[in-house]
A protein has these predicted regions:
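Short, flexible, basic/aromatic active-site loop/helix in glycosyltransferases
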Residues: 132-164
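Glycine-rich, basic loop-to-helix element that forms the pyrophosphate-binding segment
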Residues: 63-80
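A short, conserved alpha-helix in the catalytic core of glycosyltransferases
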Residues: 171-183, 190-209
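Short, acidic, metal-binding catalytic loop of nucleotide-sugar glycosyltransferases
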Residues: 21-30
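Conserved donor NDP-sugar-binding/catalytic core segment of glycosyltransferases
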Residues: 97-136
């Protein structure tokens, strides 16, 4: 297989169905799917049991004890059968060529970074009901959508690269070997944001890796939900302390 797709989920089976349905439309299907659940929700387990998967699939759970996404991701990394890991969230629907580009451009020493358009509540509902709106780009100008420029697929983007400054945890891929070299995700992050993307970014860069842009190639549609970043600064305080020490191999990761 060419890649292991790791999908982070928490309770929202309706969004996950939309994501998995978009996965069935991919031009590249030589993957395994790992559903990485930060919890043990019975409705999630029942949905996964009944869903018609087209790919090898593993469902990993852990006790719901607050935000422990980094721990869930580390367990998925260890379980993965491919050396190329693609990370997405369970509320991000995929353009049909999403997997193709993450696989096509893969190489050791590289972190691949895409972006996402944030959908309005109305467009999110249409996607949840099964509408394939990615082929109707004018819809993304709907009031309430954000980062609309990220909604458009353009094959020419492989030559006319729009740079990215940072990883986004819902749209990134990298070598399992490279990620293991920094001991995976730092499980000291117990709040949303930073730990699943920016922290990985600076530590892998410190270990010699670089970012390659997949903007407008690996396109992703983020379903609407309320977001709360009020506690992000606590994560950044810890992150800056680790950067000051150049501690790019975390102590509380895959191997404690």
């Amino acid at each position: 297989m060419k890649a292991s797709l790791i999908i982070s989920v928490y309770k929202d089976t309706r969004a996950l169905r939309a994501v998995l349905d978009s996965l069935k439309q991919q031009t590249e299907q030589d993957i395994e799917v790992i559903i990485s659940e930060d919890g043990e929700d019975t409705k999630m387990a029942e949905f996964i049991r009944q869903y018609d998967f087209l790919w090898p699939m593993q469902h990993l759970t852990q006790p719901d004890e607050g935000w422990r996404k980094e721990r869930a991701l580390n367990r998925a990394v260890v379980t993965a059968k491919s050396d190329w890991l693609i990370f997405i969230d369970g509320d991000c629907v995929l353009h049909p060529r999403f997997i193709e580009w993450h696989v096509r451009m893969r190489q050791r020493g590289v972190m691949q970074a895409g972006k996402r358009v944030k959908l309005s509540p109305q467009l999110s509902e249409r996607m949840l009901q099964g509408d394939n709106i990615c082929f109707f780009p004018y819809l993304f100008w709907h009031r309430g959508c954000r980062y609309v420029e990220e909604a458009f697929y353009c094959g020419l983007a492989q030559w006319l690269r729009r740079p990215v400054k940072h990883l986004v945890g819902s749209n990134m891929s990298m070598s399992r070997t490279d990620l293991m070299a920094i001991n995976g995700f730092d499980e000291n992050y117990t709040l949303p944001a930073t730990g699943e993307d920016y922290d990985i970014e600076w530590r892998m860069q410190a270990n010699g890796c670089r970012i390659v842009s997949l903007r407008n190639l690996a396109v992703q549609y983020h379903l609407y939900h309320k977001e709360n970043w009020q506690e992000q600064e606590r994560n950044m305080i810890y992150c800056r302390a680790q950067q000051a020490k150049n501690a790019y191999v975390c102590k509380n990761g895959i191997h404690p």
